A protein has these predicted regions:
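Non-catalytic C-terminal accessory region of glycerolipid acyltransferases
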Residues: 1-14, 118-397, 404-414
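Short, conserved catalytic or adaptor-binding loops enriched in Gly and charged residues
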Residues: 22-27, 72-74, 100-103, 215-216
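Hydrophobic pocket-lining residues within nucleotide cofactor-binding pockets
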Residues: 40, 53, 88, 169, ...
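A broad, low-specificity signal marking well-ordered, structured residues that form hydrophobic/aromatic
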Residues: 32, 46, 80-81, 126, ...
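Catalytic core of membrane glycerolipid acyltransferases/transacylases, capturing the structured
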Residues: 42-116, 121-122, 132-147
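Short alpha-helical segments and helix-capping/turn motifs at coil-helix boundaries
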Residues: 31-33, 111-114, 151
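Helix-to-loop junction immediately C-terminal to a conserved catalytic motif
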Residues: 23-53
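Negatively charged sequence features
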Residues: 12-23
Length: 414
């Protein structure tokens, strides 16, 4: 049993991961742009509501989370807590390259109504995707078409009197361009493999070559922060006077009004920022800057880059290049045809930090994080003092990006 005050967020790991692995990928591969960050309050509680997209692994959520935190200087108290679907933790292949408890160590909390409520009551800034899985798995043919919004964030925003700040995610639809989903196949994947959907055709390639399950094309994502939405006022307009009572019908109408409002603004921002989703000239220029570590930046090198950073934190330095290569021999499974069984087998037979041999089933389960986390049973500790800052970081907030040179004239804003 995990004691009260369970906090899986690992800031030391995240800062090391950012410096050694992810910030170089952000800068030279994804090259994200953050517009309007000054509209986000420095303290919570608040809900940052973003559209979901990509028809792939949730790269849009990871890039947005990392971009926001870097903008805030990697300060502990400014780290958003992401509400994510529990399926991301229950099976190892839904964590990036099987990294133990990755989503929770990165600040995520299992998505359910009670957890969401407790996070806002705690004063957290919560990153939330109101479309859920249908948003990310809608297929390229429905790109930028917002799916039905959940009513949870409407109810809780009214109950806790917190602002909802929209974020419009542009170009993440091009993480897997021309990808599609089939309903019957998705239901089969959910039932057999606990995978919410299988994107086609890349998903079929990922069945053969495991590293392609985590593939992302170099979409230059742009995150545009919109003006706060006064959800409590919208709820009152629907005649709801007691937000403690869950009124699904009226809250659903408010959620639909918010969806339509965000859809109109999203369409506008796509016209401004979405004309060059990859911007290949910028990509080539950035990759040339890191040509000596080219493979570490590209998706084909991510299995090695991500996994070695994790393992190096709990093992002595390699005795040489050959030793460094041989001790991670199991990573070849990501590149072998049908390498999934080899990866699963080595996780069972190798000792930590490579696998779980020698650990009890309960110990391995806690390390992996493949359980449903309910804050009612395992609560977060109180938030630290807002004045405490992260020590030792040299990262400074990024300047707002200039508009693209080819920017079209923006329509008048209401």
């Amino acid at each position: 049993m995990i004691p009260q005050g369970y906090e899986p967020l690992d800031l030391d790991y995240l800062r090391d991961f950012a410096a050694r692995v992810y910030l170089p990928i952000l800068d030279h591969y994804f090259r994200p742009r953050l517009v309007g960050a000054e509209k986000i309050p420095a303290e919570g509680p608040l809900i940052l509501a973003a559209n979901h997209s990509g028809n792939a692994f949730p790269h849009d959520a990871v890039v947005l989370d990392a971009t926001l935190w870097r903008h805030d200087g990697l300060v502990a108290e400014r780290k958003f807590r992401t509400a994510y679907e529990k399926e991301l933790t229950l099976v190892w292949w839904m964590r990036p390259f099987g990294l133990d408890n990755f989503w929770r160590r990165g600040g995520g909390v299992d998505m359910c109504f009670d957890n969401f409520d407790r996070q806002l009551a705690r004063g957290d800034r919560v990153l939330y995707f109101p479309e859920g899985v249908p948003g990310i798995g809608k297929g390229f043919n429905r790109r930028y078409r917002l799916q039905r919004f959940s009513t949870s964030f409407v109810t809780l925003a009214a109950r806790r009197q917190v602002p909802v700040i929209p974020v419009y995610v542009i170009n993440a639809e091009w993480v897997h361009p021309f990808g599609y989903c089939l309903g019957p196949l998705n239901r089969l994947m959910q039932r057999v493999f606990t995978v919410p959907f299988l994107p086609l055709p890349v998903g079929l390639l990922a069945v053969v070559f495991p590293w392609m399950w985590y593939l992302s094309f170099p979409a230059q994502m742009t995150f545009v922060v919109g003006d706060p939405i006064d959800v409590p006022a919208m709820v009152r307009e629907e005649g709801v006077t007691d937000a403690a009572v869950r009124d699904g019908e009226r809250m659903g109408r408010v959620a639909e009004r918010i969806r339509l409002r965000m859809q109109a603004r999203l369409d506008e921002e796509v016209r401004i920022w979405g004309r060059r989703p990859w911007d290949l000239r910028s990509l080539v220029r950035e990759l040339w800057k890191v040509r000596r570590r080219f493979l570490a930046i590209l998706p084909i090198g991510w299995p090695v880059t991500f996994t070695r950073q994790e393992r190096d934190r709990s093992r002595p330095p390699a005795r040489g290049r050959l030793h460094a290569l041989l001790r991670d021999w199991d990573l070849v499974g990501f590149y072998l045809p049908f390498g999934w069984p080899l990866l699963s087998l080595t996780r069972a037979l190798r000792r930590p930090p490579y696998g779980y041999r020698g650990l009890s089933r309960a110990e391995a389960r806690e390390i992996r994080g493949d359980f449903v986390w309910r804050l009612a049973e395992r609560p977060l500790p109180p938030r630290p003092a807002a004045a405490e800052e992260a020590a030792g970081t040299e990262i400074v907030p990024a300047a707002p990006p200039p508009p693209p040179a080819w920017r079209v004239r923006a329509p008048a804003r209401p």
